[in-house]
Design a protein with these regions (language model features):
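A short glycine-rich, Lys/Arg-flanked "PGG" loop and its adjoining helix->strand segment in the class I
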Residues: 51-70
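Class I S-adenosyl-L-methionine
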Residues: 78-121
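Eukaryotic intrinsically disordered and solvent-exposed regulatory patches
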Residues: 1, 61, 100-103
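Short, well-ordered alpha-helix to beta-strand connector turns
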Residues: 12-13, 31, 64, 71, ...
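S-adenosyl-L-methionine
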Residues: 2-41
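Glycine/threonine-rich flexible loop motifs
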Residues: 42-53
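Short catalytic-loop micro-motif centered on adjacent basic/acidic residues
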Residues: 73-77
């Protein structure tokens, strides 16, 4: 687990309290799944929020490329619109299957959704 904020200890989970941009500085083994619920601070300006989300997704994709095992899965939060199109385009050559997920707990008016990459190539 990686977070800039402290986290309660969880059995069998290695936790690194670092900025996401610094994850390449730590020594990690390859993992079977990468989960991300990260999102930028929302400004309320769609274009700015979308660009900020794309910047975070670029970092996440580099983590997937470096640390996710072949055959692994990647689940991440994104916003419908430009950032989702960007993400799907980035993932289509990295995974055999890509699914969009809108959790029941997410408000219908929210642009928040999740993208699941299945079976990393």
């Amino acid at each position: 687990a990686i977070d800039i904020m402290p986290m309660k200890e969880i059995k069998n989970v290695n936790f690194f309290q670092i900025d996401l941009k610094d994850v390449h500085k730590i020594n990690l083994n390859k993992v079977s799944i990468v989960l991300s619920d990260i999102a930028p601070n929302i400004s309320g300006v769609s274009l700015i929020d979308s660009e900020n989300m794309k910047s975070l997704l670029e970092i996440e994709i580099s983590i997937v490329d470096k640390f996710l095992k072949i055959g692994g899965k990647y689940l991440c939060k994104c916003f419908e619109g430009d950032s989702m199109i960007f993400l799907k385009n980035e993932l289509k050559n990295r995974f055999r299957k890509i699914k969009r997920i809108k959790p029941d707990a997410s408000r219908s008016t929210s642009k928040e959704c999740y993208i699941l990459g299945i079976d990393k190539i």
